[in-house]
Design a protein with these regions (language model features):
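Residues forming the flavin
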Residues: 1-181, 185-187, 191-196
């Protein structure tokens, strides 16, 4: 971003398949800029419940292990929506209904026919969301774009320089960096910076 008190322009550059810079940098005049920081599944409740989690880059990160309609390995516990993977708002809503119908069936209701129809709608809606998620999965070249003043931990306003200085004075593990700087310990609990 160019400008000090306000946005005056931005710089863009082509990236290769791994998001590493490639080619010339182009400056563009602009008075505003929209940034997308990616979406990450909210897995706090399932994780605290003891539901096993797995890393699924195609779903946006760590997600609870579950069956097709939200059933987990804990009997009678179902999960749904963006907490199970980033598939888009329409798919999240439909997935919530599917999980609800599965829970109702677990309790004795007959919902198989209704779930089959809803599952087709969910699959259609999820295709778009999953395609968008695939485009936003961070790739290795992203690290090459960081500069000393790049914010790594948004909640604690920690830059790349802060983190590197902590390592230089002896922090030899992620936990040591967390202890020294509170990196990953803000309101998001490391949700956004954990992979940085």
């Amino acid at each position: 971003v160019e400008g000090t008190a306000r946005v005056e322009g931005t710089q863009i550059q082509k990236l290769d398949a791994n998001w590493a810079p490639k080619g010339e940098t182009l400056s563009i005049d602009a008075d505003s800029l929209c940034l997308g920081h990616g979406l990450i599944p909210s897995i706090e409740a399932p994780q605290l419940s003891g539901i096993p989690i797995s890393y699924r880059s195609d779903l946006g990160g760590w997600v609870p292990d579950m069956g097709e309609d939200g059933a987990t390995s804990i009997e009678g516990v179902f999960v749904c929506g963006d907490g199970t993977g980033i598939r888009g708002a329409a798919a999240a809503e439909l997935h919530g209904t599917l999980a609800g119908l599965s829970a109702a069936e677990y309790l004795g209701s007959q919902t198989a026919k209704e779930r089959a129809t809803l599952r087709r709608r969910f699959n259609r809606a999820a295709r778009f969301g999953l395609a968008m998620t695939a485009l936003s999965i961070p790739r290795p070249g992203l690290a090459m774009l960081t500069k000393p003043d790049t914010i790594v931990c948004r909640c604690e306003s920690l830059t790349q320089t802060c983190i590197l200085q902590e390592v230089e004075v002896g922090a030899s593990s992620i936990n040591a960096v967390k202890s020294g700087l509170r990196a990953g310990m803000g309101p998001c609990g490391g949700k956004y910076c954990q992979t940085a």
